[in-house]
């Protein structure tokens, strides 16, 4: 398949996280152009808007007939396809100030409810990501988020994207995850995270990712090596299940099949001139 690859993975976008992200090696990338890898420093934030910008850039410069968007964050993909509102432009200093403000809140959801009941109604009380994003907008604009979004409506994604998902038998998937975890530990996962955790702020976004957060618990002597392996495996299996459910329920026209079937379907779609 003559294609280029766009990584929609919220961990592979970071420099220096190679083992925890199972990032393609430089050798693997040598003959195939990859986008959105090694783009951010550890203490920088990723979000759907950033991936949308990088994806549009990749689509503009890609010389191949097929651009495969792979990974990663189905939530980001859904956000990009449905459209994103322009976010407030704020300086690095303001970001730090806003983060401090939010960190002082004893119950961010209750506070959101008090300043914007309409927005709070749309967000589950456990959805910390969306609560945080809503509060960022409030502190940056001094406007209730629902009013901000009314004034800044979503802009639909301007390109046609075909959606494909790999179907893997449950036991095979679990065995793959177990082996992947073993390989990561054998390749130096703990050493990789130790070097980064001592160098960057403890609240950096990638430190919350599966594989990373458990390694930090091990470094803090809160998990044994055996527990580390078991916890990464268990959390990854749960994530795979959530992603599978999300993909099935949140995307229309999703083609699901084996590797061979998906490959055939992508090639068939590419002949009709669709990138994706």
UniProtKB/Swiss-Prot annotation:
Residue span of region Interaction with substrate tRNA: 9-12
Record site: Interaction with substrate tRNA: 73
EC code(s) of this entry: 2.5.1.75
Reaction(s) catalysed by this chain's protein: adenosine(37) in tRNA + dimethylallyl diphosphate = N(6)-dimethylallyladenosine(37) in tRNA + diphosphate
GO molecular function: ATP binding; tRNA dimethylallyltransferase activity
A biological-process GO annotation: tRNA modification
Task of the protein: Catalyzes the transfer of a dimethylallyl group onto the adenine at position 37 in tRNAs that read codons beginning with uridine, leading to the formation of N6-(dimethylallyl)adenosine (i(6)A).
Family membership noted in the UniProt record: Belongs to the IPP transferase family.
Assembly notes: Monomer.
Protein name as it appears in the record: tRNA dimethylallyltransferase
Organism for this UniProt entry: Helicobacter pylori (strain G27)
């Amino acid at each position: 398949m003559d294609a280029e690859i766009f990584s929609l993975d919220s961990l592979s976008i970071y420099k220096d996280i190679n083992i925890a992200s199972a990032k393609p090696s430089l050798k693997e990338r040598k003959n195939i152009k990859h986008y959105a890898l090694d783009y951010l420093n550890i203490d920088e934030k990723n979000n759907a808007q950033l991936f949308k910008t990088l994806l549009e850039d990749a689509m503009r410069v890609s010389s191949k007939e097929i651009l495969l968007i792979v990974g990663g964050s189905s939530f980001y993909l859904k956000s990009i396809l449905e459209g994103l509102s322009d976010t407030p432009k704020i300086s690095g200093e303001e970001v730090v100030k806003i983060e401090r403000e939010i960190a002082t809140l004893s119950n961010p959801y209750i506070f959101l409810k008090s300043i914007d009941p309409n927005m709070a109604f749309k967000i589950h009380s456990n959805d910390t990501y969306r609560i945080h994003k809503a509060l960022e907008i409030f502190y940056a604009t001094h406007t209730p988020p629902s009013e901000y979004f009314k004034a800044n409506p979503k802009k639909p994604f301007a390109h046609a994207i075909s959606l494909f998902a790999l179907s893997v038998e449950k036991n095979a998937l679990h065995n793959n995850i177990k082996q992947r975890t073993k390989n990561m530990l054998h390749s130096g996962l703990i050493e990789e995270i130790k070097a980064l955790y001592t160098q960057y702020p403890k609240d950096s976004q990638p430190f919350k990712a599966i594989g990373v957060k458990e390694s930090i618990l091990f470094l803090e002597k809160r998990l044994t090596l055996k527990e580390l392996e078991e916890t990464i495996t268990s959390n990854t299996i749960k994530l795979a299940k959530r992603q599978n459910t999300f993909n099935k329920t949140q995307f229309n026209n999703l083609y699901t099949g084996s590797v061979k079937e998906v490959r055939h379907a992508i090639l068939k779609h590419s002949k009709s001139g669709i990138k994706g």
